[in-house]
């Protein structure tokens, strides 16, 4: 669920998804195209790919179980879809934390029209 993903991002990075990640680069936020701009954008690209494999799941709106304890995100039990969505979100939030040192404010509201290089495939 998008609100749960936001909480994971905040837990890992201490930044709110909006405005820091919702419009970042070529892949963060709704949709994505061309090539990721940097490590942060690549986290979003991989997250999009992860969701893309879950074609039978309601990736943006399914509510799943998880906990935030002792510096770790742990996904809980649920349906196969809910567990997989949680894992996609957990991995992406942890990736965003690892990419904090290279986060660029210039990509924060990056116009998708400037994403020109050839697309990558998952």
Swiss-Prot record:
Activity relative to temperature: Optimum temperature is 18 degrees Celsius.
Q: Which Pfam families match?
A: Phospholip_A2_1
- The EC number(s) given in the record are 3.1.1.4
Q: Which SMART domains match?
A: PA2c
How the cofactor binds, per note?
Binds 1 Ca(2+) ion.
One GO CC annotation, please?
Answer: extracellular region
Disulphide bridges: 26-115, 28-44, 43-95, 49-122, 50-88, 57-81, 75-86
An example of a GO molecular function for this protein is: phospholipid binding
Keywords assigned:
Antibiotic, Antimicrobial, Calcium, Disulfide bond, Hydrolase, Lipid degradation, Lipid metabolism, Metal-binding, Neurotoxin, Secreted, Toxin
Q: Which cofactor does it need?
A: Ca(2+)
Under the subunit heading, UniProt states: When this protein is associated with crotapotin (F5 or F7), it forms the crotoxin protein.
Protein name per its UniProtKB record: Basic phospholipase A2 F15
Q: Which organism is it from?
A: Crotalus durissus terrificus (South American rattlesnake)
């Amino acid at each position: 669920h998008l609100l749960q993903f936001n909480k994971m991002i905040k837990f890992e990075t201490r930044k709110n998804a909006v405005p820091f990640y919702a419009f970042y680069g070529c892949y963060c936020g709704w949709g994505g195209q061309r090539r990721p701009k940097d490590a942060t954008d690549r986290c979003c690209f991989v997250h999009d790919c992860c969701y893309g494999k879950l074609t039978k799941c309601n990736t943006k709106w399914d509510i799943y179980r998880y906990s935030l304890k002792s510096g770790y995100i742990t996904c809980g039990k649920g349906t196969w879809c809910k567990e997989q969505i949680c894992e996609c979100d957990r991995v992406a939030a942890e990736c965003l934390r690892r990419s904090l040192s290279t986060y660029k404010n210039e990509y924060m509201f990056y116009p998708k029209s400037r994403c020109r290089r050839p697309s990558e495939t998952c």
